[in-house]
């Protein structure tokens, strides 16, 4: 039997406008939303008393994501149940059609506690300790890397086995490079606060075009699923970009655990429907459900930084690249002189 918890949040409308006339009506609604939160394995419960048919709607990201029709009940309040498991996580608004001034705002959290994973080091490869790594991705057996900082930002192609540069270009001094990803034989490289993305030919490194970000605040990490791109901006949002529409930001998912939102998602990597993400100033990798935004697991890398040469410019973990043939992850950090090939222990 499901426990029904009355909410302190309710609608009580005694008058409303319809066809420019004021009609006396009463709509009473109570929900099981507690502390403005529900989890995605909960069932939204509405206790409704209305003398007319109603349509409840749920909005997310300014888009309509659910329609909940309710039949009138003349004398008694009735309960209605709606499952939430197919919705994305994050901030939602529940309202009655034609009564958008009356809203229940709530946050949908994940029902799962993130699982903690350890790792095993398979190999270590030397590299320059001057690489301020912002993005990392394999194309076949070749590693591509985006290096940051004003006046030092680069796009490089690397033989990871010996650290030799196979190609490189220096960005203008007023651009701070961030994440990169490869799709349709093009390299997409983000900038930080400049709010533009750069598009290069994969083979020649010739710049083809650029694009504006839209509503995202900054450029942090980026990855792709072969069709769409997924871009972080330092907030809890990961934006979904359409390469067929000049990388237009079509939508976003919000990243949450079972308790709260997660911000500062940095370098991203797409593997088998999951987004693997560094989090700025945290020594680990979040495993994100790309459909709903739930953090399903965390790879604990807390002692990895100790295994590189310690120096005054040594910075945070940042850089995830998945090698599809080797079925392993390559991880590194800003100003690290090593890149580690690791296996996730599940």
Give the positions of each predicted feature.
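Beta-strand-rich domains and repeat architectures in extracellular enzymes and scaffolds
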Residues: 122-154, 169-181, 333-335
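Conserved beta-strand positions in repeat-built beta-propeller and related beta-rich domains
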Residues: 145-150, 189-195, 231-235, 277-281, ...
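Bacterial signal peptide processing site
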Residues: 18-21
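A short helix->beta-strand "capping" segment at the edge of beta-propeller domains
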Residues: 110-130, 160-166
């Amino acid at each position: 039997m499901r426990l029904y918890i009355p909410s302190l949040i309710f609608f009580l409308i005694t008058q409303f406008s319809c066809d420019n006339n004021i009609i006396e009506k009463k709509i009473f609604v109570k929900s099981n939303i507690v502390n403005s939160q529900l989890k995605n394995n909960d069932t939204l419960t509405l206790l409704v008393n209305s003398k007319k048919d109603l349509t409840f709607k749920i909005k997310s990201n300014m888009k309509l994501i659910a329609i909940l029709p309710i039949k009138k009940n003349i004398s008694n309040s009735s309960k209605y149940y709606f499952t939430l498991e197919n919705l994305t996580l994050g901030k939602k608004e529940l309202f009655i059609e034609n009564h958008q001034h009356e809203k229940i705002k709530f946050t949908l959290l994940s029902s799962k506690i993130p699982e903690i994973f350890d790792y095993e080091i398979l190999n270590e490869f030397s590299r320059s300790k001057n690489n301020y790594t912002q993005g990392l991705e394999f194309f076949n057996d070749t590693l591509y890397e985006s290096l940051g900082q004003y006046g030092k930002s680069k796009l490089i192609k690397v033989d990871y086995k010996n650290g030799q540069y196979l190609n490189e270009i220096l960005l203008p001094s007023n651009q701070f490079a961030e994440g990169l990803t490869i799709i349709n034989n093009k390299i997409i490289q983000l900038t930080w606060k400049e709010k533009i993305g750069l598009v290069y030919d994969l083979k020649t490194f010739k710049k083809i075009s650029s694009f504006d970000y839209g509503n995202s605040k900054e450029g942090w990490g980026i990855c792709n699923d072969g069709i769409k791109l997924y871009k972080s901006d330092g907030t809890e949002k990961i934006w979904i970009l359409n390469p067929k529409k000049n990388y237009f930001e079509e939508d976003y998912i919000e990243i949450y655990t079972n308790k709260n939102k997660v911000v500062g998602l940095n370098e991203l990597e797409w593997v088998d429907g999951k987004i693997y993400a560094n989090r700025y100033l945290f020594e680990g990798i979040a495993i994100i459900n790309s459909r709903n935004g739930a953090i399903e697991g965390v790879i604990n890398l807390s002692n990895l930084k100790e295994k590189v040469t310690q120096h005054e410019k040594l910075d945070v973990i940042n850089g995830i690249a998945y090698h599809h043939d080797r079925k392993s992850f390559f991880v590194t950090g800003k100003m690290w002189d090593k890149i580690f090939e690791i296996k996730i222990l599940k």
